[in-house]
Structures are given as structure tokens and as C-alpha cells.
């Protein structure tokens, strides 16, 4: 114990925390501490196999070490510590704080030792009539026996009160950041031993059909704890390594490892692994570790060749486990959590009710199991932010309806995770160990019968679905050739045929029955409009029997046969005023069936066969009043249509939950950034903060000018560096749109900072007189490179922090792959479009484009024909009600790269020479999707593509185009592309110019060109370009 150093600051902080809880309980009625005025903690002789209870825990919590044969007495005024001389010199380090500490040293003289014990008993009696003790304390040894004798003689009138729960609530259960860090580390160490180490060992044993005892496999895992090399090199399932500051020497076992299989399961972990042979069926593994005195546990169920019943029950176990995790939060009552889980089991699968465990976990920390914090249906304790629990969900001894052998008749299922309670969903410290069915199921029986799958090319982890071979170190757009690799083209055609067949099969399976109503044209419903519920709600002016416009209720009250009749504005089509002599006429037209064939006139009616009044006409000599009424009706109609449209636009806007702010520490901040879409008011940079369940952008202009984005609403997170760009970007694509600023609806929120500063021209500056050459320009360039690199590092680091904070929602940082990008026109301007692992994006300038690849049903390349300089790309989504997405005017040089990108992303595509009417096509698809796939589905696109390719080959072999015809073709191609509404304005302008200008005769142009070519030695390419250049 020569190097023992007690942290006196931590000691005083924790003593203060404990005393504050004690005094607060006294003020509020002694509900927790039971009115005790002193507390005695005893530590006896250390056992060979120590069990950690609250007496050990108080030592570790306050001192960081365990001091055997030591007595601690806490009174409201003083802390007394009675120990040996050797230990006393270390305890002198904690003296001198807010709460006085008196260290009493015992020696070998029994009489002197008895006097010290009497001094302690006198302090207990002086403090009050109630003393707090640990009634279940099992401390043993001569020291304990001596104390009990003196205590029995001197404290006969003192009442003992069990303070186990008080110590748990006031000291151990809520952890500080240092304690939580130790628990996170011990949890990750548990994960590392379970997955990958135990999982790999178990898989190899089963794969090679070896016979091994449970105890032997457990010993392998047990001995791995001493392997320092393992701890330095092991990777967790999420490819992360353990913390660099991990000290393997401070790791120790608290549970197991326990391995169970073959129908014998004990989910209370009361026995070590037995000597039975590992049975390939249901296998349970559980283990627990201690790191820096803080414990964690984990347990997983692995299934080998499970039947449908076992898979179903495991999925249900996972659902119950997730339900419990969602219910655990700050303020929840323990028994309520268990009751909700129990009721869920009873309602969904009543046959499993009797197999459900009697508790769903317990508190953990310095104690490997806090007996005062058992998660059962009797515990009334309230969970608090900072508590750590082991959540255990299990079903024991379930009967197997289809046992494969005698050892498979009965099985159990269990999941155990160490978690931290927060104000929202808990943080699962052992969450890196997978729990889904695919990760925990192993199939060996059908392995030989399975068809061999073709070996996939190894892909870079950053690239994902994008083909790796498209990435080269020095490939520029200008260097891309348009020649086609025949082998690659053949391979791509074969792959595309497979994808097309797969899409057709999926479509037939998904839409096995007619879906005209579900996925077809939306059926409009008849809406009832009630202007007034009672007569007394009519406007007072109706007594005059005139036409009254009620703006408040959006109603026009008309006099009909001496009675006021209300008409809601939505029943009126329009109103008009006309003059005839001295009379003015007001005509009000109503909506009725059969008025038109346009989409706007498709108005639903309750009974279309009923009689309808189509119009009412009123006449008067007061023309000005009629003009005013007609104007008011038109304005009211316009406002109603606008309001209805706004309501429709906001239908998909989902109200987010509240952002839970971090209170106990400063949140991670990225300062001096702009947001897009921009907020109201002056454009000024704000800051982005990472909180518990989301991020917040705060404008410096006002505290109300802020944008909250929850992690649960984030679908994609992108970081785009400032290389080749003027700004560095963190871009968030949302699942559901949110409102920003003045009712701006958006699914994309972006934070950016400009990467370049304003440059000053210093020509003629005094400084330039004394500096020659370009040294200053070189320095400025170097400085800009450094600034850009620093900006990239800063934004990338912050994006990774966002992903880390939202890892429970599956958020990962994605970066665009610039080398695979291409130019195109998704909206009005020509932009550079780049693929990422999961998307195709353009986030440099608004409007932004984010297309998720997994949402795409098929892609179609339009205007792919000889002579055209560009083509269009159309994406059809799996949600057929969503309009297809067009990217126009892509240079033909990018055609092969786009095809390769689509093919490597497993997107079925086709091509054709013309632009298709996608509105009509999608209307056909949605009208009856079942029939659409029966008729061949998307095959009609592929058939057109194949026909075009055959025709093109025949044309190429039949004749050779000359220069003049090539010019004509290129002009006409520009004209053909003009009708696409989304084509670039530049292309349209060029086409119009070529139509309007008149050039020389073609024969004359050709003669002159040949003559000039002979004189200057130009090649064919320049010969073709010369006439066109002259016409421009």
C-alpha cells in the first residue's frame, strides 16, 4: 500500500453531497434516512472471494480504496475513522475540509482499543437515539467481534435503522462524470470479450463440429482478461477501438463468464458454467467486469438453426426489451416500468406470461447488484438522471414445439444491457453488441444446399454502394473519354437484366392484388361546411334582407324567397357583375357536377345525382354596391383557396418533441456559422450546439430566433469540405420537414462558413516598394490553404460529434465523392452533383438536392442518341405517389460514368432517345399497380432501350455521316431538347439563336471550309467546329 494516494478533493465533494442529502431528508420528514443522527459502517477481514456490498462501496466511493478492519462513524458534525496505525497515515490526507475528520489509531493493547470503541459509542449516544447500520452486513473477524461486544454493552437504548437504501439514494445511485466514464469503459470491455472474442470462438467450435465443455469455453474467455495485447488491438462491432487510456490491470471479473446451452438454463446466474458439452441450439452467454471499482454486465442469446417459433419469441423478447428501455427515464417509477412490460407480454403473447422474469434488472455501479434498486413490481423508487442500471429481459424454460433432439425440448431467452438513465431515452453502454435476429442467428444445416453466391468486389468502406474502380487518384472530367469498354458493357447489361427481373418479381409480390384505391389516384372526399349552428349566430344585417358578406365565417348570406340563406365560400365557384341599361346584375355561380373536365373541377359531391342550383342572379340599380360585393366574394374565395393550399402544404410537417438541453455542462459548440434556409432579419452568423437529443442553431439577434433539430428526425448527415468550393458545409437531411423562420417548410438544413477572406490589391502600396517578386502572394496562398484545412478539420470534427451524440438513432457522417461527380441541371442552374455512400446530392447552392438511393425504384436515361451533346436522367421512386425526379442536360462525356454509378449502386436503369411524359406514365402506374406489373412493369422502358440500340448499330454500319449533316444534327438536337421544361436556359437560348440566324448556303460553307482546311492544316474536329463558331 506504499503508493496509495487518496484524492481529498473528491472525498470532500462526495462527503458534502452525502451530507446534503441527509440534511435535506431531515428537513422533509426523515422518509429516506429514518431519522438517524449517526451512521456506522464496518469493514472486517478481507475474504479470499470478496463480495461487494455497501460497506465496501462507501470505502471505494469516498477513498478510492478498501480499508479492511476499519470502522467509520458519520455524525452530522464529525466523521470518525477507527483503523490501524499503518492505514491511519494514509487517511491523514483527507483531513482539513468542511467536515472535520478524526482518525483514531488502534494498536495491540486490548484495553486501549476498548477505550477507542467506547469513544465511538459515546459519540453515537451524543448524536441521538437512532443509529444507521447495514443490517445485512456480513463482515467477520476479531475486530468486528470486539466492536459488537462493546456496542452491545454501551448502546442498549439506541435504536438501529437500516440505511442501505439511504446510502444507495444519497451516495451511490446517481453517478458523476468520472464514475460514468469508468462504467462506459467497463461496459465496452464486456462487449469486446463477448463480441468479437466469445462469438468468434463459439462460431469456430460450431462450424468445425468440435465438442467442448461450457466450463472450458468459459475459461478461455476468463483467461483473455490477462491478455494485454488483446486489449490494445481488439475492435468493437462498430469498428471502434477501446479507449486509449484503458488500463487492463484495473479490469476484474464480477460475473462469470457463464455459458449455458442444452436445455439447462439458470437466468439468475447463481452457478458457474457446468461441464456439459456446448449444444448447437439456444446458447446463452453472460459476463460482468469491474473497472476502477465500477461494474457492468452483459448477456446475449445466440440461436443455432432456430425454428420459426424460437425466432418469433426472440423477436418478441427484443420488442419487450426495447419497450423497457423507452420507459426508463428520469422521473419514472420502478414498478411502473415493470408493470408496463408485464402487461405488454400478457396482452401480446399471453402464453409467455408465466415464463417472464420476476424482475427486469437492477442498479449497478460500485455494487455489482444494488438490492435496493431491483426493477420489479414492488419497488416504488424513482429513477433519476445519472443512475446506472442493468436491464435484463428474459423468458425462462419455454417449451419447444419442434425440438431437434432431447436437449432442445426446453429453452430460455435473455438480453442484458448496462445503461445510463437520462431525461429522455437511456444511453446503452453495451449497445455495440448487436441484438437483432440476423446478428444472433447461425444457420449450418442448409449451408451445403445453398447456392454459391458470386464473389463481390471488395469496396472501400467510404464508398459503399458506389463502384470502387470509378475512383482514381488523378482522374479529371476533361480526361474522361466516351469510348465504351465492351467487356464492362457486357457485364453491365447482364447485371441490369438481373436487376430488371428482380424488380419485376418484387413488384408482382408486393402488389399481388389490385391496389387501385390504396396506391392509385387519391379519392377526394366530400367535405361538409357548416357556417352557423343556430339561427342566432347570423350577422345582424340579415334583417335588412340584403346580401351580406360574413368574413369571419367565410360565408355569403343571400335573400331567397324572403329568408336569409347562408352559402359557405367553398360552395361558390365565382361571382360577376354586369350592367344592362340602368340595371346592374350580380351573378353568383355555385359548384355542381358536370361543369368541366379539368382537374380543378373534379369536385366531390355527397350525391351527384341530386338537383343542384348552378347560379343565382340578383338585379339592382345600385351598381357600385354590386361591384363591391363581387369584389369581396372574389377576395374571400381567393383567401379560402390560399388557406386550403397552405393547410395542404403543411400536412407533412410533424411537430417535433422538445429539445432536451444539457444543463450540467457546456454543450459542444460550433460558432460563427450561417444557416440555410436563412432566418428572418439581418444576415448574421450564429452558433450550433449539441444537446441531449438534438442540435440547436441560435441566432445572436434574439433568443427566439433558433432552430431545433432532433436526432430522431435526422435521416442523413453530410460533411462537405471546402476543397474546390467557397464554403465548408455540414448538411442535415430530415425525415420530416420542419418550419424555419417565417413559415418556411424545409427538409434540408445547412450550416456553413465561407472559406475565403476578402483579398486586397496591394499594387502601389508602400509595402510593395520594398518587396520584390511574389512572396506576399505566395504567403497569402499558403495562409488560405492553412485556413481551409483548419476549417475542414473543425467542421468534420463537429459533424462527427453530432453523429456520436445521435448514434442511438443510427446517424453517421457521409461525405460526397467528388471524383465520381457530374454536371447536371436538377432545377434551373447547372450544378455539380456528387454521390455519397447512400445518396446523390448537390448541397453547395440552393435549392438543394438529396436523393436517397434506397428510395429509387428505377432510373431512365432520356435523349440518349447519336449526335446529342447531353442527356437527361429521371429517377422513379418506390413511392409511386411521389413525382419522378429529373436531372437534365448532363454532358454526354459523363454517360458511361453515370451508367456505371447506377449499376454499381444496384439501380435498374434503361435508356431511350426521347423525353417521356412521366405524368401520364405514373398515372397509369398508380391507377392499377397490380395490372401494371402483370403487363410487364418497367419492361416497356427496357424494350425501347434495346430497340434503339439495335437501330443505332444498323445506322452506324449502313452509312457514314459527313460534316454538314453532323452540323445539322447537332443543331436539331439542341432544338429537340428545348421542350423539356427543366432544361438549362443556356441550351434554350442557343437553340433559339440558331433558329433565328441566317447563314450562308451549305454548299458554299463546305467549299470554303475545305479550302481553309487545306491552307491551315486543321484536323477534322476543327473543321466541324469552324462553321458553327462563325455562325455564333
From Swiss-Prot:
Residues 485-506, 624-658, 785-805, 949-1010 form a coiled coil. Residues 446-513, 943-1032 are annotated as: Disordered. Residues 476-508 have a biased composition (Basic and acidic residues). SMART domains: FACT-Spt16_Nlob, Rtt106, SPT16. One of its GO terms (cellular component) is FACT complex. GO terms for biological process: constitutive heterochromatin formation; DNA repair; DNA-templated DNA replication; nucleosome assembly; positive regulation of RNA polymerase II transcription preinitiation complex assembly; regulation of sister chromatid cohesion; transcription elongation by RNA polymerase II. Residues 944-979, 986-1004 have a biased composition (Acidic residues). Its main location: nucleus. InterPro entries: Creatin/AminoP/Spt16_N (IPR029149), Creatinase/aminopeptidase-like (IPR036005), FACT-SPT16_Nlobe (IPR029148), Fact-SPT16_PH (IPR056595), FACT_SPT16_C (IPR048969), FACT_SPT16_M (IPR013953), Pept_M24 (IPR000994), PH-like_dom_sf (IPR011993). Pfam families: FACT-Spt16_Nlob, Peptidase_M24, PH_SPT16, Rttp106-like_middle, SPT16, SPT16_C. One of its GO terms (molecular function) is nucleosome binding. It is found in: Nucleus; Chromosome. Keywords: Chromosome, Coiled coil, DNA damage, DNA repair, DNA replication, Nucleus, Transcription, Transcription regulation. Component of the FACT complex, a general chromatin factor that acts to reorganize nucleosomes. The FACT complex is involved in multiple processes that require DNA as a template such as mRNA elongation, DNA replication and DNA repair. During transcription elongation the FACT complex acts as a histone chaperone that both destabilizes and restores nucleosomal structure. Belongs to the peptidase M24 family. SPT16 subfamily. Forms a stable heterodimer with ctc-1/pob3. The dimer of ctc-1 and ctc-2 weakly associates with multiple molecules of nhp-1/nhp6 to form the FACT complex. This is FACT complex subunit ctc-2. It comes from Neurospora crassa (strain ATCC 24698 / 74-OR23-1A / CBS 708.71 / DSM 1257 / FGSC 987).
Amino acid at each position: 500500500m506504499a503508493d496509495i494516494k487518496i484524492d481529498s478533493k473528491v472525498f470532500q465533494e462526495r462527503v458534502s453531497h452525502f451530507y446534503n442529502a441527509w440534511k435535506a431528508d431531515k428537513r422533509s420528514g426523515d422518509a429516506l434516512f429514518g431519522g438517524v443522527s449517526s451512521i456506522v459502517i464496518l469493514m472486517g477481514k478481507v475474504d479470499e472471494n470478496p463480495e461487494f456490498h455497501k460497506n465496501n462501496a462507501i470505502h471505494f466511493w469516498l477513498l478510492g480504496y478498501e480499508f479492511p478492519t476499519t470502522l467509520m462513524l458519520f455524525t452530522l458534525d464529525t466523521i470518525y475513522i477507527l483503523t490501524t496505525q499503518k492505514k491511519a497515515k494514509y487517511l491523514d490526507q483527507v483531513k482539513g475540509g468542511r467536515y472535520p475528520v478524526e482518525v483514531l489509531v488502534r494498536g495491540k493493547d486490548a484495553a486501549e482499543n476498548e477505550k477507542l470503541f467506547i469513544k465511538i459509542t459515546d459519540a453515537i449516544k451524543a448524536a441521538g437515539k437512532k443509529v444507521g447500520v447495514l443490517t445485512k452486513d456480513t463482515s467477520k473477524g476479531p475486530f468486528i467481534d470486539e466492536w459488537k461486544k462493546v456496542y452491545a454493552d454501551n448502546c442498549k437504548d439506541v435504536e438501529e435503522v437500516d440505511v442501505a437504501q439511504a446510502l444507495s439514494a444519497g451516495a451511490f445511485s446517481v453517478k458523476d462524470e468520472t464514475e460514468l466514464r469508468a462504467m462506459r469503459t467497463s461496459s465496452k470491455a464486456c462487449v469486446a470479450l463477448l463480441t468479437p472474442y466469445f462469438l468468434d470462438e463459439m462460431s469456430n467450435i460450431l462450424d468445425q463440429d468440435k465438442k467442448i465443455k461450457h466450463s472450458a469455453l468459459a475459461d478461455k474467455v476468463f483467461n483473455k482478461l490477462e491478455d494485454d495485447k488483446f486489449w490494445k488491438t481488439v475492435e468493437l462491432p462498430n469498428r471502434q477501438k477501446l479507449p486509449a487510456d484503458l488500463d487492463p490491470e484495473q479490469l476484474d471479473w464480477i460475473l462469470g463468464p457463464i455459458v449455458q446451452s442444452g436445455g439447462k438454463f439458470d437466468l439468475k446466474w447463481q452457478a458457474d458454467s457446468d461441464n456439459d458439452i456446448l449444444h448447437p441450439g439456444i446458447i446463452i452467454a453472460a459476463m460482468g467486469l469491474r473497472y476502477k471499482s465500477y461494474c457492468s454486465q452483459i448477456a446475449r442469446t445466440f440461436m443455432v438453426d432456430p425454428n420459426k417459433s424460437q425466432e418469433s419469441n426472440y423477436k418478441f423478447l427484443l420488442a419487450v426489451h426495447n419497450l423497457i428501455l423507452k420507459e426508463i427515464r428520469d422521473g419514472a417509477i420502478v414498478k411502473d416500468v415493470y408493470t408496463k412490460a408485464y402487461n405488454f407480454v400478457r396482452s401480446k403473447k399471453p402464453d409467455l406470461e408465466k415464463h417472464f422474469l420476476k424482475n427486469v434488472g437492477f442498479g449497478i455501479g460500485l455494487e455489482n447488484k444494488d438490492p435496493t434498486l431491483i426493477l420489479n413490481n414492488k419497488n416504488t423508487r424513482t429513477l433519476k438522471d445519472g443512475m446506472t442500471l442493468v436491464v435484463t429481459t428474459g423468458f425462462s424454460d419455454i417449451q419447444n414445439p419442434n425440438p431437434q433432439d432431447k436437449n432442445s425440448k426446453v429453452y430460455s431467452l435473455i438480453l442484458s444491457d448496462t445503461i445510463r438513465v437520462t431525461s429522455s431515452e437511456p444511453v446503452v453502454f453495451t449497445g455495440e453488441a448487436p441484438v437483432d435476429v440476423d446478428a444472433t442467428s447461425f444457420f449450418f444445416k442448409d449451408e451445403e444446399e445453398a447456392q454459391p453466391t458470386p464473389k463481390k468486389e471488395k469496396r472501400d468502406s467510404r464508398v459503399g454502394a458506389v463502384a470502387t474502380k470509378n475512383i482514381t487518384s488523378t482522374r479529371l472530367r476533361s480526361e474522361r473519354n466516351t469510348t465504351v469498354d465492351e467487356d464492362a458493357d457486357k457485364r453491365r447489361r447482364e447485371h441490369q437484366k438481373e436487376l430488371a427481373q428482380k424488380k419485376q418479381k418484387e413488384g408482382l409480390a408486393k402488389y399481388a392484388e389490385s391496389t387501385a384505391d390504396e396506391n392509385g389516384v387519391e379519392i377526394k372526399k366530400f367535405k361538409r361546411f357548416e357556417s352557423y349552428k343556430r339561427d342566432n349566430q347570423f350577422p345582424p344585417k340579415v334583417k335588412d334582407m340584403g346580401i351580406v358578406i360574413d368574413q369571419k365565417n367565410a360565408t355569403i348570406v343571400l335573400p331567397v324567397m324572403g329568408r336569409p340563406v347562408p352559402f359557405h365560400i367553398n360552395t361558390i365557384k365565382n361571382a360577376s357583375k354586369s350592367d344592362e341599361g340602368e340595371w346592374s346584375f350580380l351573378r353568383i355561380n355555385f359548384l355542381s357536377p358536370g361543369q368541366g373536365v379539368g382537374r380543378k373541377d373534379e369536385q366531390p359531391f355527397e350525391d351527384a345525382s341530386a338537383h343542384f342550383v348552378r347560379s343565382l342572379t340578383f338585379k339592382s340599380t345600385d351598381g357600385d354596391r354590386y361591384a363591391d360585393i363581387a369584389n369581396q366574394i372574389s377576395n374571400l374565395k381567393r383567401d379560402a383557396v390560399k388557406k386550403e393550399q397552405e393547410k395542404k402544404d403543411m400536412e407533412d410537417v410533424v411537430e417535433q418533441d422538445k429539445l432536451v438541453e444539457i444543463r450540467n455542462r457546456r454543450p459542444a459548440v460550433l460558432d460563427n456559422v450561417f444557416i440555410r434556409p436563412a432566418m428572418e432579419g439581418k444576415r448574421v452568423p450564429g452558433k450550433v450546439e449539441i444537446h441531449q437529443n438534438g442540435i440547436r442553431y441560435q441566432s445572436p439577434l434574439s433568443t427566439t430566433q433558433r432552430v431545433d433539430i432532433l436526432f430522431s428526425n435526422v435521416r442523413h448527415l453530410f460533411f462537405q469540405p471546402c476543397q474546390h468550393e467557397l464554403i465548408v458545409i455540414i448538411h442535415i437531411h430530415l425525415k420530416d420537414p420542419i418550419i424555419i423562420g417565417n413559415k418556411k417548410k424545409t427538409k434540408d438544413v445547412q450550416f456553413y462558413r465561407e472559406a475565403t477572406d476578402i483579398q486586397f490589391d496591394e499594387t502601389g502600396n508602400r509595402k510593395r516598394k520594398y518587396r520584390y517578386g511574389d512572396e506576399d502572394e505566395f504567403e497569402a496562398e499558403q495562409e488560405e490553404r492553412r485556413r481551409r484545412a483548419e476549417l475542414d478539420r473543425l467542421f468534420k470534427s463537429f459533424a462527427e460529434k453530432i453523429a456520436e451524440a445521435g448514434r442511438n438513432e443510427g446517424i453517421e457522417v457521409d461525405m460526397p465523392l467528388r471524383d465520381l461527380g457530374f454536371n447536371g441541371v436538377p432545377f434551373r442552374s447547372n450544378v455539380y452533383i456528387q454521390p455519397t455512400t447512400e445518396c446523390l446530392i448537390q448541397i453547395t447552392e440552393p435549392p438543394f438536392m438529396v436523393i436517397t438511393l434506397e428510395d429509387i425504384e428505377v432510373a431512365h436515361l432520356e435523349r440518349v442518341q447519336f449526335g446529342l451533346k447531353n442527356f437527361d436522367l429521371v429517377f422513379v421512386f418506390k413511392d409511386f405517389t411521389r413525382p419522378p425526379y429529373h436531372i437534365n442536360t448532363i454532358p454526354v462525356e459523363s454517360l458511361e460514368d453515370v451508367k456505371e454509378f447506377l449499376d454499381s449502386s444496384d439501380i435498374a436503369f434503361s435508356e431511350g432517345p426521347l423525353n417521356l411524359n412521366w405524368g401520364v406514365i405514373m398515372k397509369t402506374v398508380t391507377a392499377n399497380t397490380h395490372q401494371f406489373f402483370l403487363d410487364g412493369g418497367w419492361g416497356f422502358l427496357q424494350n425501347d432501350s434495346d430497340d434503339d440500340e439495335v437501330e443505332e448499330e444498323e445506322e452506324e454500319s449502313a452509312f457514314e455521316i459527313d460534316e454538314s449533316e453532323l452540323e445539322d444534327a447537332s443543331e436539331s438536337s439542341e432544338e429537340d431538347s428545348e421542350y423539356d421544361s427543366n432544361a438549362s436556359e443556356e441550351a434554350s437560348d442557343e437553340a433559339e439563336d440558331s433558329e433565328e440566324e441566317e447563314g450562308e448556303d451549305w454548299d458554299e460553307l463546305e467549299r470554303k471550309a475545305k479550302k481553309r482546311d487545306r491552307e491551315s492544316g486543321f484536323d477534322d474536329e476543327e473543321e466541324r467546329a469552324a462553321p458553327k463558331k462563325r455562325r455564333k
